Amino acid sequence: MSRVCQVTGKRPVSGNNRSHAMNATKRRFLPNLHSHRFWVESEKRFVTLRVSAKGMRVIDKKGIETVLADLCVRGEKY
């Protein structure tokens, strides 16, 4: 399973670790992902999504029904 938020599309980005001497070594910044079950009232079932913390805030704001409709338009399965 890839490290991508199903709602926002956040994915790992690359950057540098910086030591005290400012030496640079490559690293990855990973999104804050969680598998979370959401209750969908219209379908009377739980839906499990892999979402970031920002994705959970989007679901709180828009509602799970709207977010799932957007996923269907993009062609993603949930």
Swiss-Prot record:
<feature type="region of interest" description="Disordered">
    <location>
        <begin position="1"/>
        <end position="21"/>
    </location>
</feature>
<dbReference type="InterPro" id="IPR001383">
    <property type="entry name" value="Ribosomal_bL28_bact-type"/>
</dbReference>
<dbReference type="GO" id="GO:0006412">
    <property type="term" value="P:translation"/>
</dbReference>
<comment type="similarity">
    <text>Belongs to the bacterial ribosomal protein bL28 family.</text>
</comment>
<keyword id="KW-0687">Ribonucleoprotein</keyword>
<dbReference type="InterPro" id="IPR037147">
    <property type="entry name" value="Ribosomal_bL28_sf"/>
</dbReference>
<dbReference type="GO" id="GO:0022625">
    <property type="term" value="C:cytosolic large ribosomal subunit"/>
</dbReference>
<dbReference type="GO" id="GO:0003735">
    <property type="term" value="F:structural constituent of ribosome"/>
</dbReference>
<dbReference type="InterPro" id="IPR034704">
    <property type="entry name" value="Ribosomal_bL28/bL31-like_sf"/>
</dbReference>
<protein>
    <recommendedName>
        <fullName>Large ribosomal subunit protein bL28</fullName>
    </recommendedName>
</protein>
<dbReference type="InterPro" id="IPR026569">
    <property type="entry name" value="Ribosomal_bL28"/>
</dbReference>
<dbReference type="Pfam" id="PF00830">
    <property type="entry name" value="Ribosomal_L28"/>
</dbReference>
<keyword id="KW-0689">Ribosomal protein</keyword>
